């Protein structure tokens, strides 16, 4: 029988039948009659559909294959022969677009002219018996049944045979031919007698024994047995009626579905108040580096040695003084702290051998700056149960802050190219499989686009600072250790370079829990005059500490050098994530990769090379008040990387909340743009949830502003 099937039927039909039997665990070498029956059924379904089209007037016409009008719309959608998931997707799509009622079982075809699903039956028994079995199983008036037999008989719902007589005759002739061929080979009797009552392959695929017991134990709540759950899943409608879902909820849920139109959404309301301030753990665009090229000094690679060597490259030190005080701090203590750092570094240089680490003297100014003895004494809760007025201390609501232009400038700067190379990804061996070759090619192209990017500098700076601070917090818990803020890079010519941004002094760090805080004072070099944007530097005390000679097109010029000093704090968990900032490279690479995959699937070949080397093509980068901003693929890579880096640098509960809630509104707007006619309930509540996250965080406020630009242009 198997040989007969392979000779008698089209190879595509044979392949589909093999897949169907494999899917339900049936062996076609044993179940040869089943194999023949599936092939026959598939062929009848395809013949039913062949040559039938709908013209522009909506009339059904029969067109032979050579006819130039074959571009007309097919009258029948073939569902049989697809894998289950795809078949249900097609059925759901038809139901959504035509309003047809969803069938309980997968039908074989959909008739676009009559707007109904069709169940095709091919029987070796009495036609009317088989028809009744089908009707009892389907139990739906909306699915049309059409039965064919090998004897030339037929039966259809309400005697409506759908097809013209010639098309039906073609199918009957083919079935009669199959029967004759089987009879000639002595296969017909076995085939005819093997037909059981109406069933599907899936119904006959029974799970028994231990697997059955495990299946019944693994069901979600409210399902008594596997059959009930299977029926529920088969009938589940992903785009089902929201009202129906709501009706199953608590009686207190009272939601009315409102249509979401272009005029529905309003802009997100950003808070009023004083401008927001810089809150990153280290300076970004305003940082200044003291650098040494091709370092080869004694102790090269030891942070303190490197720092002293970098400090020696600058000769413009002067008596420091305060140019922008911290409003609430004791500014003289910040000034004294810097003087202490300079003095203790000088002491180190006077020693015969420079130590590997430097612990600062615990002076009154450092104790104040690091909050020593400032924390309230912790008392065990069990010892205060009897205190009648025990309560949590009052904390003020955070003051609302408005968006300020400096954060957009910071982001723009992070996307720019520098004149240094900040990452060198290690070689990871030869590529063996083709997929590895493609992955390496993508990684190399991406690295070339972002290795000079300022956001990549921030990654390496963040990794170094957090690693050094966590190490010191564990190794020198009671000491006020001096930690240089260092990064390493290469010049365009390939020369190594070590950079010093400033110093951190760590406070006491007995960090038992992940969230226990270690205080530190940061002192960072800069050429930015804080008086230009004083609101940005609210948390800082800024000193003028020297004059730097800069070369420019018009010759040398002197610029004042500033030191930005502030008290800050971090925790083990924050340092742990800071150490892993390189993940930002991976995240943005994956986003670029999904763009390449989308392009490749359209072109049906890998488009990596074209994607990166076609310099003339521009890509959307983001929304601005001017509209959709576009740029080269390199600019897209750097922008995505900068977004990922800023998400890490400015991580906060406000950002988590805004990202989660605004995503819901974004999905609804995208559904509207895709003409999916979305409906919403409690849109006001969603806006409330979004806007309660807009408090004072500069990065969140900027993202909200971008979201408003997107809303404006998306709904034009």
UniProtKB/Swiss-Prot annotation:
Binds 2 manganese ions per subunit. Mn(2+) 1 binds at residues 41, 108, 119-120. Mn(2+) 2 binds at residues 80, 108. Signal peptide: none annotated. A motif (Nuclear localization signal 2 (NLS2)) lies at residues 184-247. Plays an essential role in viral RNA transcription and replication by forming the heterotrimeric polymerase complex together with PB1 and PB2 subunits. The complex transcribes viral mRNAs by using a unique mechanism called cap-snatching. It consists in the hijacking and cleavage of host capped pre-mRNAs. These short capped RNAs are then used as primers for viral mRNAs. The PB2 subunit is responsible for the binding of the 5' cap of cellular pre-mRNAs which are subsequently cleaved after 10-13 nucleotides by the PA subunit that carries the endonuclease activity. Influenza RNA polymerase is composed of three subunits: PB1, PB2 and PA. Interacts (via C-terminus) with PB1 (via N-terminus). HAMAP family: INFV_PA. This is Polymerase acidic protein. The gene is PA.
């Amino acid at each position: 029988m198997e040989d007969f099937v392979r000779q008698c039927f089209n190879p595509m039909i044979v392949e589909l039948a093999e897949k169907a039997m494999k899917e339900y665990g049936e062996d076609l070498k044993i179940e040869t009659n089943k194999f023949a029956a599936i092939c026959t059924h598939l062929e009848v379904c395809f013949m039913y559909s062949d040559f039938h089209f709908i013209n522009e007037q909506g009339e059904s016409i029969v067109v032979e294959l050579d006819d130039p009008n074959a571009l007309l719309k097919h009258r029948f959608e073939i569902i049989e022969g697809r894998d289950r998931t795809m078949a249900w997707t097609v059925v759901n799509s038809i139901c959504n677009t035509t309003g047809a009622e969803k069938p309980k079982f997968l039908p074989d075809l959909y008739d676009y002219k009559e707007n109904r699903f069709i169940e095709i039956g091919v029987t070796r028994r009495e036609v009317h018996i088989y028809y009744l079995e089908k009707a009892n199983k389907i139990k739906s008036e909306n699915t049309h049944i059409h039965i064919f037999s090998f004897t030339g008989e037929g039966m259809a719902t309400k005697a409506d045979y759908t097809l013209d007589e010639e098309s039906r005759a073609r199918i009957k002739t083919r079935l009669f031919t199959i029967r004759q061929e089987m009879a000639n080979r002595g296969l017909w009797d076995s085939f005819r007698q093997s037909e059981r009552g109406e069933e599907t392959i899936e119904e006959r695929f029974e799970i028994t024994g231990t697997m059955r017991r495990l299946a019944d134990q693994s069901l979600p709540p409210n399902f008594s047995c596997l059959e009930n759950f299977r029926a529920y899943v088969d009938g589940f409608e992903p785009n089902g009626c929201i009202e129906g879902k709501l009706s199953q909820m608590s009686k207190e849920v009272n939601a009315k579905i409102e249509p979401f139109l272009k005029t529905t959404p309003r802009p997100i309301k950003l808070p009023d108040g004083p401008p927001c301030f810089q809150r990153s753990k280290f300076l970004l665009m305003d940082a200044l580096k003291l650098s040494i090229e091709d370092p080869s000094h004694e102790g090269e690679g030891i942070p303190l040695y490197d720092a002293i060597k970098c400090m020696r490259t600058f000769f413009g030190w002067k008596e420091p003084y305060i140019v922008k005080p911290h409003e609430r701090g004791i500014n003289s203590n910040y000034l004294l702290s810097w003087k202490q750092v300079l003095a203790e570094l000088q002491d180190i240089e006077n020693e015969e051998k420079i130590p590997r680490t430097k612990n600062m003297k615990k002076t009154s100014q450092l104790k104040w700056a690091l909050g020593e003895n400032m924390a309230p004494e912790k008392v065990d809760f069990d010892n205060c149960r009897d205190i009648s007025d025990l309560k949590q201390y009052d904390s003020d609501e955070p003051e609302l802050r408005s968006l300020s232009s400096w954060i957009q400038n910071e982001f723009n700067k992070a996307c720019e190219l520098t004149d240094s190379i900040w990452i060198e990804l290690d070689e990871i061996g030869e590529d063996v499989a083709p997929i590895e070759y493609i992955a390496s090619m993508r990684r190399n192209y991406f690295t070339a686009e972002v290795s000079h990017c300022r956001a990549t500098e921030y990654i390496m700076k963040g990794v170094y600072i957090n690693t050094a601070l966590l190490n010191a917090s564990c190794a020198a818990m009671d000491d006020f250790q001096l930690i240089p803020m260092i990064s390493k890079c290469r010049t365009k010519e390939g020369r190594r370079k070590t950079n010093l941004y400033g110093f951190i002094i760590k406070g006491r760090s007995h960090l038992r829990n992940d969230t226990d805080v270690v205080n530190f004072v940061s002192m960072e070099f800069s050429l930015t005059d804080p008086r230009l944007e004083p609101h940005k530097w609210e948390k800082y005390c800024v000193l003028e500490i020297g004059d730097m000679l800069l070369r420019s097109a018009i010759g040398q010029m002197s610029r004042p050098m500033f030191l930005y000093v502030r008290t800050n704090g971090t925790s083990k968990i924050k340092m742990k994530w800071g150490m892993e900032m390189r993940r930002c490279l991976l995240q943005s690479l994956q986003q670029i990769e999904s763009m390449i995959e989308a392009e490749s699937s359209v072109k049906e070949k890998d488009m990596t090379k074209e994607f990166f080397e076609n310099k003339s093509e521009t890509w959307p980068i983001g929304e601005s008040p001017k509209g959709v901003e576009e740029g080269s693929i390199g600019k897209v890579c750097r922008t995505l990387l900068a977004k990922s880096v800023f998400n890490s640098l400015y991580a906060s509960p406000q950002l988590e909340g805004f990202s989660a809630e605004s995503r819901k509104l974004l999905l609804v707007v995208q559904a509207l743009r895709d003409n999916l006619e979305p409906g919403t309930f409690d849109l006001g509540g969603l806006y409330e949830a979004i806007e309660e996250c807009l408090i004072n965080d500069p990065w969140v406020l900027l993202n909200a502003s971008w979201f408003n630009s997107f809303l404006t242009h998306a709904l034009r």
